[in-house]
């Protein structure tokens, strides 16, 4: 009987050949966006501290924020934060019973979360630039 169990286990665990459902992708990206947001808090607090330290510090922070690369990073941070908040609300709505916990409802809510995040990302781009 033990030999049958071993034969039924998956052999190929190459992640490039496994097709994740959209709900798994949404969950993984939620974790990634949380890590990005966590790291970004330190960077943003440093930038805030620099800008509030003195008039020269404010000028330095303004010069840093004037760079296209920094604006792009800021847009990425805001997009990650927006995604994390939107999908976090989705998870809370499922936990509180406001959304069905079926696979179809999960796929639908994940797609809606992606669309809302794209809209918020575009708004963040307008805000940054």
Curated annotation (Swiss-Prot):
Pfam families: Sdh_cyt. GO terms for biological process: aerobic electron transport chain; aerobic respiration; cytochrome complex assembly; tricarboxylic acid cycle. The heme is bound between the two transmembrane subunits. Belongs to the cytochrome b560 family. InterPro entries: SQR/QFR_C/D, Succ_DH_cyt_bsu_CS, Succ_DH_cytb556, SuccDH_FuR_B_TM-su. It comes from the Bacteria. Residues 53-68 are periplasmic. Part of an enzyme complex containing four subunits: a flavoprotein, an iron-sulfur protein, plus two membrane-anchoring proteins, SdhC and SdhD. The complex can form homotrimers. Residues 1-26, 90-108 are cytoplasmic. This is Succinate dehydrogenase cytochrome b556 subunit. Keywords: Cell inner membrane, Cell membrane, Electron transport, Heme, Iron, Membrane, Metal-binding, Transmembrane, Transmembrane helix, Transport, Tricarboxylic acid cycle. It is found in: Cell inner membrane. Heme binds at residue 84. NCBIfam families: PRK09487.1, succ_dehyd_cytB. It comes from Escherichia coli (strain K12). One of its GO terms (molecular function) is metal ion binding. One of its GO terms (cellular component) is plasma membrane. The gene is sdhC. It is a multi-pass membrane protein.
């Amino acid at each position: 009987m033990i030999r049958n169990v071993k034969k039924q286990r998956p052999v190929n665990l190459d992640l490039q050949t496994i097709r994740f459902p959209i709900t798994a992708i949404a969950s993984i990206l939620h974790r990634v966006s949380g890590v990005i947001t966590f790291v970004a808090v330190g960077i943003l607090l440093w930038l805030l501290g620099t800008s509030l330290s003195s008039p020269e510090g404010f000028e330095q922070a303004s010069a840093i924020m004037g760079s296209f690369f920094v604006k792009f990073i800021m847009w990425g941070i805001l997009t990650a934060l927006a995604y994390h908040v939107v999908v976090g609300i989705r998870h809370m709505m499922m936990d509180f019973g406001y959304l069905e916990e079926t696979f179809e409802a999960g796929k639908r809510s994940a797609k809606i979360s992606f669309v809302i995040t794209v809209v918020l990302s575009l708004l963040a781009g307008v805000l940054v630039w």
